[in-house]
């Protein structure tokens, strides 16, 4: 466990010196909040629900960790990488809501050196955007499909959306 100042220097690590804990606390120093999971009732994806803190199992700022068994390598999601200016303008495709359609090829979020689009952003309000990313190198369920989540520009946090709402777990969220 640890504690990191959000948007400021300084962090504490208490007992667990794993790379995942260090990466998570450094994320707070970079200004990031937790990567959460949107739990909506009645088998809906985006209906009224609640944000489950740390609920994104695929993100370092959630409950994701560096795990060689699952292939997770301690990455932040596409919204966080974009917010930190780790992606160039050409690596994120902004799709204006209802004004633009098209077919876009997503490249692996964890391989930015490949060029191409690594995240799709769909602004839906001044307070929230849809984000889509693909992480096949991570393996497991992430190799099977894209992940969709909300990014909140004013709060620097995110909510993973469950595209398999008939279950209560976030681990089957990829398309």
Model-predicted segments: where are they?
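Extracellular hydrolytic enzyme modules, especially secreted metalloproteases
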Residues: 1-139
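Zymogen propeptides/activation segments of proteases
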Residues: 111-175
């Amino acid at each position: 466990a640890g504690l990191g100042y959000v948007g400021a220097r300084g962090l504490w690590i208490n007992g667990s010196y794993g790379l995942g804990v260090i990466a998570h606390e450094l994320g707070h120093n970079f200004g990031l909040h937790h990567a959460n999971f949107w739990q909506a009732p009645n088998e809906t994806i985006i209906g009224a629900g609640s944000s489950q803190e740390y609920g994104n199992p695929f993100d370092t700022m959630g409950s994701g960790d560096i795990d060689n068994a699952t292939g997770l390598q301690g990455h932040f999601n596409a919204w966080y990488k974009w917010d930190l200016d780790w992606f160039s303008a050409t690596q994120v495709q902004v799709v204006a809501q209802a004004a633009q359609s098209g077919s876009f090829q997503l490249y692996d979020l964890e391989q930015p050196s490949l060029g191409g689009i690594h995240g799709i952003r769909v602004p839906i309000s001044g307070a929230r955007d849809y984000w889509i990313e693909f992480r096949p190198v991570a393996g497991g369920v992430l190799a099977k499909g894209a992940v969709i989540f909300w990014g909140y520009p004013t709060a620097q946090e995110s909510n993973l959306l469950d595209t398999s709402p008939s279950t209560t777990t976030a681990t089957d969220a990829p398309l």
